[in-house]
Amino acid sequence: MAENRGERRAAVENRYDAWDHEQAMKAAVRKFISYDQFSAQLRNWREARLNIIEHATSVLSQVSNLGRTHFYSRTERFGGSSLVGDKLYVCLNETRMKTALNNIIVALQTVNGEGRARRLGPREASANTGGEDSALNVAHQLAEVDDLLTDESFLREAVFTQDKYELVNGLRWAGAXQLTAQAFWFDVNAAIDEIDNRLLAAAALRLLPGQANHVDGLVSINYAQLDRALSVVGGNILPQTLEITRDERKRQLPEVRVIDGERVTIRNKDEATVIRNHGQGLPWLLAFLLLLLSVVVVYSTIYLNDWLYRLSVVRHGKPGGGAARKLSGMSDWLCSRLRARGALNVNRMRKKQACDPSPTGLRKFLTCYNFSYELWDPTGSYDDAQRRIIAEQNSFVEAVRAIDEGDRELAEACLTNVRRILRRHLNYRPDYFDIIEAKAVYLVTVLTNAMSGPVVGVDDDERRAVVAAFNPSDCGLPNLDSCSLDEIKNFDLSEVVIGEGTNVEQARGYLNLCRNIQCMIETIGTVQFLGVLSSYTGPQYPCISQAFAEDKRIRKERLKDKDNITTADIIAYLVSGVMVAYALVAVSKGGITLFKFMKNYAGGGGDRPGSSRRIRQLEAALPSLPQPEELTMMERLRRPQSSDNDLALRRNPSDMLSQVVRDVVADVDSSDIAESLNDPARMTEAALEIRLTRIMSAEGSPVDVIEPGGQELISMQVHGESLTVINAGTDSPTVIRSASLSTRHRSSGIEIGSFAVDKVLPYEVEGENDDHGDAGKKPTVAQALMIGGGAVKGQGNLGVTNGKELLKVLGSSRSIGKMSGKMAV
């Protein structure tokens, strides 16, 4: 079955697809030569500059026949079908190269002094001077060609590899062992730029054929370009934020003029390269805005600190002073924290150790790894655990170095080692690992191509016979000609043990081939697999074909999801924009409102009111407010409504006096009441007065009299409510509810003045004209008792003549009705 597959592959003709007349004309006209052969020939000519004149005919023939046309054709691949790796070729049709070679040919043709004769004339020229003239001219032209081989623009335009030339001209090689088509997401321009970047890096490091292998001094390397060159392998692996188009103008050739018989070479200054950036630059804009915001925050923190302090001093005791003082304190705290953090970082930088052989130190090293190849020194007083960590760091660095240097044999093992160390010490995938993995997978793919390709010194028939004679199942290895993608992916090659036998070397090579294929297919669906797609030219095993199909399916699904998400993202961006605009408006309004509040209402840092402006506004609006009615207390009592400020429901003064008498009688002994009822003649005013005095002395007066500052105060309980009377000894006592006073301890006395206006009830003894308002008809206690008891009115001299006596009488009772008199606020 394998033989039939080989016959079918051999039946497919190797050729270029899309070959047309234009491609045929290019192949017939263009002359190519390998870069190493051309540089070696050029070095020989420069070392034997004087001998060139002696062998002018031979050298002229070499220069004239340099390179060859029909370097490739429809059925002959550019550079050869069995090419492995990157081999450089120079196009001799490039304008500057063609002009330099023509000048060398002209100089060699004038060996007999023709060039000097043209400048000085035939009389002054001699035949033996032509060699010196031609040798000098040839030396200049050879130096120019040597400089041209390392020129940046020349490397981009006239130096090609097999892949670069096919990508530039749109050629696609179709054969039995090659890919028939490129992936639809393959970026040709990015692949060409990747090859050019490698050429430029090799020229800067003096690694091109013919360059000196040593450089005086240190070599400056642009690590940003180097990282991009390492990451972009065979395609546009890393997505670019900005689309860059390079607009380069070709170098103008030196102009040769004849002035006064002398040939003068005029070199024009090359124009600078113009690079235009266009495309989606939103991430760069956001980065710039964040940088600008950071600068504004830092500057505001530094500048506003002093400004807020001055503001807090100026506004002390004024509106906004308290808020300014708090903001100044917050700014001082923030500045102190920034200074402390900066001092801590500086101290850490000063005391930074060469290495930190601890799990935390290695984790920090792996997190901040920047492709440095500095190894930790294991010599020192370290324990076993620290030495193991140092060994892991050295192993990691050496593995990355081997991958970076392009060691194809160790690429798979080094990548496995790097993965193992990262998985052990980090719980995430760092960004730089994509660069390492892309380069390693590319090297593994190139090695797989070489292992599957022809062997030097062994013909194809013999190689196929050896492969057919080897049976992988005998060594416990999977058969790549029949196993599927899942089988090779899930096969554990670590358990395979190669025993002693006749096919040990072949079994080990087959095992390495299986490991390389496993390493390649592990990157299916990632950007690293693009390197496999673009560079794999080995046999199309079933697992390889399934891997390509699976990767294509995954990318199509992602592209479809990306298109669907794009529409949703547009809607989300619009909604976010509206919300941001609304938030900005709300923040602006809130800021204005807060500023007005801080200006008008915020309390100052001193004793002044919070806002004199607000007070003036209230004073201006006061005349327009409705004024309260000026009514007397009796007018309010006569209204058919009750108020919570009244002491009780309003009643007739006679009823109130009768109630007082009844309350007094209730405290009298029942035997006295019965005696007075049986013998009313004994109940004279003197007897009643004596009885009343005895009762009052027995119970004690519930009235406390305090005289602070000449004002007599009386505290009494009326209907369960505590009252305080001011100016009780005058004709106009003032009654105050004690609940309206400030709550203070009894030892500190009564605080005068801190009560509500509506709680003050002035009382005038000279009341309105009623049954008891006339001075001649003021009732005595005896009369009150007589009225309350229903007896006849007696005679006595105990009368209520002022407010103090009335309050004392009222205070001696358990309950009190409404007082008679004029009550007003």
From Swiss-Prot:
The gene is CP-CP2. Its main location: virion. Keywords: Capsid protein, Virion. Minor capsid protein involved in virus transmission by the vector Polymyxa. This is 91 kDa readthrough protein. Gene3D superfamilies: Tobacco mosaic virus-like, coat protein. It is found in: Virion. GO terms for cellular component: viral capsid. Disulfide bonds: none annotated. This protein is translated as a fusion protein by episodic readthrough of the termination codon at the end of the capsid protein. Readthrough of the terminator codon TAG occurs between the codons for Ala-176 and Gln-178, thereby producing the 91 kDa readthrough protein. Belongs to the virgaviridae capsid protein family. The keyword NADP does not apply. It holds the Pfam family TMV_coat. One of its GO terms (molecular function) is structural molecule activity.
